[in-house]
Amino acid sequence: MSNEIHLFTYCLILILQLISAVSNTFILTLFYRISGLSSNKHLRLILYLTISDFLFTICELPYTIYITANWNPYVFNFDPRFMLISSIPLPAQLKISAILTISIALNRNIALIYPGVYLRINQQNYANVTAVIAVAFAVFDVILCFTFSDYEPKPGCGSAGCFVGDEFRYYWGISNTILGFIIVLLSFTIFLKLNHQKNSVLRKSSNDARFRQANRISIGILVSSLIFLTTPSIFVGVFEICGFSAFKLVGPFYAASLLFSGICNATIFIANNGDARRIMTKKTTTSFFYNNNNNNNTNLNT
């Protein structure tokens, strides 16, 4: 039964990768074509998160295709070096996504609690520094992963997580659990502040449509992260610390969680952005009338 669970996970990841690639490509195209989005300093962190989701989706494809194509109903016997190299995007994106999410949550906390300080912060520099820190931690995780990896074959192992050493899994579990708790804490303070908002200075600054839009998108992304990243990270971290490996049970489920999170982030952005909704509505309407005209012409010809 375990091998069938792995196969289901592999197929699910392939489907999610297709959806994630399309949705994040659409958002990146919007940022490129609409000057109001690219110049919106409040959305810079959202842009970086979208870029990381897109790159993860594309770079993880060789790994997903390999494990799906070489699935065996009886015994797995994957090449350890290919598994480790092709799975590099997973630990990197998990750390990047967590740090960017923490930065988004911290930024919203500052905006809600200390609006005067928030207005003095250069949002572009804040986002750029966050991106550099996130990439640095991701590189550190990848180096540790290869340092403590076991390059020996692991018959019956259906995930790259089985090839990394116990030291890295222990570190990974603790670090991701800590980051998860930070996200929970910052998110809780945001929700609490929104329910008891009495700051007249913030209400005045909140009249800015760009600020309100960034607020809605950020809160939506935090909820998505809590569901698809933080909760799994905490549970997996506890399991790893206790000596149990979830990788051996359900395969690369972390990749599925990251993809779910990326798709939800894209959906939240589109739902809260008027330009994105107008473009999608326009394309849908145009496609509908185009198909109707083709059908009418076909009926007239017959």
Report the location of each language-model feature.
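Seven-transmembrane-like multi-pass membrane architecture, highlighting hydrophobic TM helices
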Residues: 1-302
